[in-house]
């Protein structure tokens, strides 16, 4: 074989993907692992966990990583285990029957944009309630046959992992995600390469984002990732951390989500009836939508009417401090080319993000822009509707707050995700067979009176015992890593009262979360914390 001097002296780099090899009979096993449907199907989860419970926990209940870490001989042996193969075929049949249901085309199709999604702990692209709601939204849309796709960002480090030292101080760890070990897949082009979206940032440079897809039942979630060699060292970290970096990086993230997200759907040939912006982070989808309509020959006014008529904005934050504001200089640095594309002036663009048009001292607010470009705006509870109407009242001068078009849809949860296997079985045994598809039906819920009180109370006690066991295991593991005196840990666990009321404050302990409400009635607070039936209270604090 002959080599030219060029090939001898210059490295020839090739990208390869390394993956685990499964016996052909278990390909269906891997297929289910790559669809997050397993996160809310108890039979699917037990199929994985039952094989090797210890390895399942070591793999952090991630079926993709779990299969990768299993020995090939162990996997090969499964193919000769008739009992396991029958179970797998039964679960797979349920899975395929679920996927084969056609979307309900009598309802509007939806494109959903959010900065975070709380789908499962194995996919660290969420930090709090906003993400959990978004994740449940996708799961419920899948269960309800809604024709929906979603767009978000794929973070290399996600949000932080929390551990507690013996002195109660929070320890923060950012561990990188190995995308090849997650239940996601690359979106491929016809030439066999991963799809890359080229997003213009100002006139001077372009950011290149790899496109991935997470299958959430019947819903496709497209995720953008900038941590690749096409980008400079300054742009690769755009998707390193959720809500990480300074305000400039936050703006870069929101440009990627909004403008880059819309570009992604266009490349994939996806068009929907409604474009849903989950919080103001994704508001720039409407900049790109305006540009697309204008490029087709419409003027700005016509394009705005079409965009507004098909846009929905959900606001979650109850106070102005929780919204994103960008200084005009920073906003101009990255958006200065858009007035020409839109056929408007720079001041007109800025005014779209100002409560008071013409106020030069006012920064560009993503939430204000979302309100002005969306026909439908909703809060997340009846009370939050009233709060939001007051908060956005300056946008509609001459109207009483209660007259503006901010409505509400009360937050809910995806029942199959948050209900334990034990409760699911209890409901299945005692409720109407239509319960899972009609969970808010009060007539069905009347069946709860047929369940003996002792059965319900004993169920709660058993589940609480499991919770306490988990808390001890989790704290013990963290303390072991911190080289804490074991005797001190044991003494704390011995004081743990299983009969005490446990209150988990499931939100970040940021100031605008209004934790000070605990101290509005000090006498009542004193009675609660000093009562012989105590309360355990543990909030989650932000990394900063």
Where in the sequence are the language-model features?
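Catalytic cores of carbohydrate-active enzymes across secretory and cytosolic contexts
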Residues: 1-540
